[in-house]
Amino acid sequence: MEQGKGLAVLILAIILLQGTLAQSIKGNHLVKVYDYQEDGSVLLTCDAEAKNITWFKDGKMIGFLTEDKKKWNLGSNAKDPRGMYQCKGSQNKSKPLQVYYRMCQNCIELNAATISGFLFAEIVSIFVLAVGVYFIAGQDGVRQSRASDKQTLLPNDQLYQPLKDREDDQYSHLQGNQLRRN
């Protein structure tokens, strides 16, 4: 069993090292994303050393900027900007940067206060429901009259009337002359 654990650790270490090596290979990452703007807009910045910068989205040219304006505004992050963006200077073209925003408009941030609020509301609602069921079920809906306590009860032999013997009825005898066939 120890050999299996050792093999699993070795495989995991190899996979993690491959990911680290793949990330450390530096490419031509000239495009950077800045999405912490006060107005909620998403900006792309090109670090190319050129006077004129051309922006591409999904392989198609979308804009042309001068050197002093290296930032491309994608608009509000609530509009879910997405696509493969590249910038090109006079000498080189950046690697593509995939931008994909998925903003949740009606989401709730789950933190300790929110979860405790949900739990408190759930406990209170269960308590209110239990108290309501207790009071509704505890009420006597039909009250018996006191006259039933004063009735004279019949003796056991008078409760039931004996059956009369009849020869003409189908079920008048328990045993029949004919056997039932399937």
Swiss-Prot record:
**Short motif Di-leucine motif, span:** 153-154
* Any one cellular-component term (Gene Ontology): external side of plasma membrane
PTM-bearing positions, type Phosphoserine: S145, S148
As for PTM, the annotation reads: Phosphorylated on Tyr residues after T-cell receptor triggering by LCK in association with CD4/CD8. Phosphorylated also by PKC; leading to the TCR complex down-regulation.
Name one process (GO BP) from the record: cell surface receptor signaling pathway
* Phenotype when changing L163A: Abolishes lysosomal targeting
**Can you tell me which residues are glycosylated?**
N52, N92
Do you know which PROSITE patterns this protein is assigned to?
Answer: ITAM_1
Q: How does it sit in the membrane?
A: Single-pass type I membrane protein
Consequence the record notes for mutating L154A: Abolishes lysosomal targeting
* Topological domain spans for side Cytoplasmic: 138-182
Annotated InterPro entries: CD3_esu/gsu/dsu, Ig-like_dom_sf, Ig-like_fold, Ig_4, Ig_sub2, Phos_immunorcpt_sig_ITAM
The record's subcellular location field reads:
Cell membrane
The disulfides recorded in the entry are C46-C87
TM spans (from-to): 117-137
Which disease does the record tie it to? Immunodeficiency 17: An autosomal recessive primary immunodeficiency characterized by highly variable clinical severity. Some patients have onset of severe recurrent infections in early infancy that may be lethal, whereas others may be only mildly affected or essentially asymptomatic into young adulthood. More severely affected patients may have evidence of autoimmune disease or enteropathy. The immunologic pattern is similar among patients, showing partial T-cell lymphopenia, decreased amounts of the CD3 complex, and impaired proliferative responses to T-cell receptor dependent stimuli.
Q: What is known about its subunit structure?
A: The TCR-CD3 complex is composed of a CD3D/CD3E and a CD3G/CD3E heterodimers that preferentially associate with TCRalpha and TCRbeta, respectively, to form TCRalpha/CD3E/CD3G and TCRbeta/CD3G/CD3E trimers. In turn, the hexamer interacts with CD3Z homodimer to form the TCR-CD3 complex. Alternatively, TCRalpha and TCRbeta can be replaced by TCRgamma and TCRdelta.
Q: What exactly does this protein do? A: Part of the TCR-CD3 complex present on T-lymphocyte cell surface that plays an essential role in adaptive immune response. When antigen presenting cells (APCs) activate T-cell receptor (TCR), TCR-mediated signals are transmitted across the cell membrane by the CD3 chains CD3D, CD3E, CD3G and CD3Z. All CD3 chains contain immunoreceptor tyrosine-based activation motifs (ITAMs) in their cytoplasmic domain. Upon TCR engagement, these motifs become phosphorylated by Src family protein tyrosine kinases LCK and FYN, resulting in the activation of downstream signaling pathways.
UniProt name for this protein: T-cell surface glycoprotein CD3 gamma chain
Q: Per UniProt, what is the name of the gene that codes for the protein in this document?
A: CD3G
